[in-house]
């Protein structure tokens, strides 16, 4: 194989290589002959289609597919030959001829000796108690509550139907009439100042409130301004919670309506949630320790920039989903995420290095257990499992997640660690 490697930066490499033309032609010829034997074309007997006809119909597609496969195979072979470990995907450009290519990519930095025994990790523990199950049942009752109109002043927990209009300087919103809506006091859906202002209002009463809107508020006319918000309580209703009886229990999928089975199912769900929360805490603990120990190692610039752009895109998407206006995104907006992105990249590369150096292998049993755990949160678990198994992208993401968890556990077991007990509520709190 003709291939040469050169350094174009501390962590950037340029690989120039040539595809073996004979192998390409051999592959194309073999594929065309195979198609000639199996393709049915009107006017020709099966297996008797002339090669020229097959080439006219399929030659361009077959050659493109063969070129793509051989390009990938040749590049991978050159990477192995030069003992390169890529950080991210390469950019491959055409060279001087049809068979010459130039690949530019970044490599994993040299972390030196990775000694995880010097790390200090706090490993949190927690368990689901009967009180946690009681609280969850109370939350489920709140989900199924009905509302009873009352004549008294509004209290936390009440549902208030309201009318509002706002005055921002000389501008009234809406220009005419009022906006209508409703909110449960104490839910945090509205501004805290508005919720506090609604407390004590009875049906038909109104009040003017001075509210400071954040600069990124979804309504441009209000964003970053101090606004007079006029609110009127149209109706005040108190919650009526359902009894925990057989009908209530059956509504949550427990066909027998048995209270003990209901509590057992809730315990299973809470323990699943707790397991994920404790792993996330451990992931953060290990990540922070790795960052502190290896912050001096230079990260691949392009990989960090791509991660920063991905983080920006996620934030913009979250803002839009929550109704906030992200506004016009400057071309360099991702720069504000560069530090966080560098830390993410550092942890990701270190986790990969620990797995490689210690020959850690993906545990298929753990993959199956995790998949069953994910599927158990849906009404049709078997369909979810089948969906994953038939989707290579979903399975790849699942395997990556499980492998990362294996490495995190491996590091935590060998690091200096202390245990800290938490309540269930504290453990799941972000």
UniProtKB/Swiss-Prot annotation:
Subcellular location per UniProt equals: Cytoplasm
User: What would be an example GO MF term here?
Assistant: ribosome binding
Domain-related comment: Consists of 3 domains; the N-terminus binds the ribosome, the middle domain has PPIase activity, while the C-terminus has intrinsic chaperone activity on its own.
Give the reaction(s) catalysed. Answer: [protein]-peptidylproline (omega=180) = [protein]-peptidylproline (omega=0)
Primary role: Involved in protein export. Acts as a chaperone by maintaining the newly synthesized protein in an open conformation. Functions as a peptidyl-prolyl cis-trans isomerase.
Q: What class of enzyme is it?
A: isomerase
Name recorded for this polypeptide: Trigger factor
Kindly list the biological process annotations in GO that this record carries.
'de novo' cotranslational protein folding; cell division; chaperone-mediated protein folding; protein transport; protein unfolding
Family of the protein in this entry: Belongs to the FKBP-type PPIase family. Tig subfamily.
> Which residues does the UniProt record annotate as the domain PPIase FKBP-type?
157-242
Q: What is its main location?
A: cytoplasm
Return the InterPro entries for the record: PPIase_dom_sf, Trig_fac, Trigger_fac_C, Trigger_fac_C_sf, Trigger_fac_ribosome-bd_bac, Trigger_fac_ribosome-bd_sf, Trigger_fact/SurA_dom_sf
One cellular component GO annotation, for this chain's record? cytoplasm
Q: Which UniProt keywords apply?
A: Cell cycle, Cell division, Chaperone, Cytoplasm, Isomerase, Rotamase
EC code: 5.2.1.8
């Amino acid at each position: 194989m003709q291939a040469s490697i050169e350094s174009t930066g501390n962590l950037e490499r340029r690989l120039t290589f040539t595809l073996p033309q004979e192998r390409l032609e051999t592959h194309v010829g073999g594929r065309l002959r195979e198609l000639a034997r199996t393709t049915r074309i009107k006017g020709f007997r099966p297996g008797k289609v002339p090669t020229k006809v097959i080439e006219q119909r399929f030659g361009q597609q077959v050659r493109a597919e063969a070129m793509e496969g051989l390009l990938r195979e040749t590049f991978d072979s050159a990477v192995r030959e030069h003992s390169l470990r890529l950080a991210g995907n390469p950019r491959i450009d055409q060279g001087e001829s049809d068979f010459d290519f130039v690949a530019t990519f970044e490599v994993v930095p040299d972390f030196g000796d990775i000694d995880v025994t010097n790390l200090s990790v706090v490993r949190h523990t927690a368990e689901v108690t009967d009180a946690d199950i009681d609280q969850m049942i109370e939350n489920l009752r709140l989900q199924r509550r009905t509302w009873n109109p009352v004549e008294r002043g509004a209290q936390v927990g009440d549902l208030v139907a309201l009318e509002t209009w706002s005055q921002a300087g000389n501008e009234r919103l809406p220009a005419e009439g009022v906006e209508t809506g409703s909110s449960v006091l104490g839910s945090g859906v509205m501004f805290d100042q508005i919720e506090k202002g609604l407390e004590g209002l009875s049906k038909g009463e109104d009040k003017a409130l001075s509210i400071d809107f954040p600069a990124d508020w979804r309504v441009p006319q209000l964003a970053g301004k101090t606004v007079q918000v006029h609110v009127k309580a149209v109706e005040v209703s108190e919650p009526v919670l359902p009894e925990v009886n057989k009908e209530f229990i059956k509504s949550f999928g427990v066909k027998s309506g048995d209270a003990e089975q209901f509590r057992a199912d809730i315990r299973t769900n809470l323990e699943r949630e707790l397991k994920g929360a404790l792993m996330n805490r451990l992931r953060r603990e290990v990540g922070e320790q790795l960052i502190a120990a290896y912050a001096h190692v230079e990260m691949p610039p392009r990989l960090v920039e791509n991660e920063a752009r991905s983080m920006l895109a996620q934030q913009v998407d979250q803002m839009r989903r929550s109704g906030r206006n992200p506004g016009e995104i400057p071309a360099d907006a991702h720069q504000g995420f560069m530090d966080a992105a560098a830390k993410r990249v550092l942890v990701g590369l270190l986790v990969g290095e620990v797995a490689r150096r210690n020959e850690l292998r993906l545990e298929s049993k753990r993959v199956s257990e995790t998949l069953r755990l994910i599927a158990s949160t849906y009404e049709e678990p078997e369909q979810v499992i089948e969906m994953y198994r038939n989707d290579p992208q979903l399975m790849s993401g699942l395997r990556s997640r499980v492998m990362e968890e294996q490495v995190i556990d491996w590091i935590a077991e060998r690091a200096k660690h202390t245990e800290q007990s938490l309540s269930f509520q504290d453990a799941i709190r972000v």
